[in-house]
């Protein structure tokens, strides 16, 4: 210890640089580990990651000559693959996530993260409601212009979560009625994060008539007693049909 103190007194500048550099390196490694843990561990609102299987964006082409290749799956395609999986407890389809101009009026707003989801999304992810409710089956099926927003947006626009319920909130200059307000979700959660959530059925009421190409993804929750590898095998069999 005396030798260390003597070295520090002899070379205070280099000793300080060495100590600070070591501290910064340790802090950097700890931050990376914390971010990795947050993005991979079973933490709310993505509290069942270890039981989830995620689709990729998909890739389609003509079988005859491999021409007309496209990335991305339509609702029709993703539903055909994931709808009848015996090993899946729940499947949620995620529409495209966009940055859109949003605000409490057409002339007052800013770009926000808008996520398009179905009803099962709220069963797969644990996002607590602060006020109001989630959009209903009837609203989803009827393509109603309803939206669930985060608590921060509600406070900024209307003063409180409770005051936001029933008000109009403009998404891409189109009014949508606020039916619910959730707790804010950190952007570290890849699939649960959003500032606004709306039914993807409001984007296109004729989803079943499209072709293979689109912007949908799927997240499947594995049934108890079924392994993730088994569910992946079922997905591959479904693709082969």
Predicted feature descriptions by range:
Residues 1-9, 77-81:
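A short amphipathic helical element positioned immediately N-terminal to and/or at the very start
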Residues 3, 27, 31, 217, ...:
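Amphipathic alpha-helical recognition patches that constitute DNA-binding helices
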Residues 11-39:
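Short, strongly hydrophobic transmembrane alpha-helices
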Residues 33-157, 163, 171-176, 233:
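Structured, solvent-exposed hinge/loop segments at the ends of secondary-structure elements
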């Amino acid at each position: 210890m005396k030798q260390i103190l003597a070295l520090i007194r002899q070379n205070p500048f280099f000793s300080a640089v060495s100590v600070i550099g070591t501290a910064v390196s340790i802090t950097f490694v700890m931050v990376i580990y914390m971010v990795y843990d947050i993005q991979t561990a079973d933490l709310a609102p993505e509290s069942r990651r270890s039981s989830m299987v995620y689709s990729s964006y998909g890739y389609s082409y003509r079988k005859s000559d491999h021409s007309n290749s496209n990335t991305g799956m339509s609702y029709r395609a993703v539903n055909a693959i994931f709808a009848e999986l015996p090993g899946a407890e729940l499947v949620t389809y995620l529409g495209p996530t966009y940055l859109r101009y949003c605000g409490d009026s057409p002339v007052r707003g800013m770009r926000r993260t808008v996520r398009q989801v179905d009803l099962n999304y709220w069963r797969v992810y644990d996002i607590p409601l602060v006020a109001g409710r989630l959009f209903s089956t009837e609203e989803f099926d009827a393509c109603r212009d309803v939206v669930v927003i985060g608590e921060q947006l509600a406070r900024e626009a209307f003063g409180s979560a409770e005051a936001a319920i029933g008000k109009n909130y403009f998404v891409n200059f189109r009014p949508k009625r606020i039916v619910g307000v959730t707790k804010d979700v950190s952007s570290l959660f890849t699939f649960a994060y959003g500032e606004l959530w709306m039914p993807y059925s409001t984007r296109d009421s004729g989803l079943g008539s499209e072709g293979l190409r689109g912007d949908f993804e799927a997240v499947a929750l594995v049934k108890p007693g079924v392994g993730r590898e088994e569910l992946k095998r079922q997905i591959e069999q479904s693709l082969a049909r």
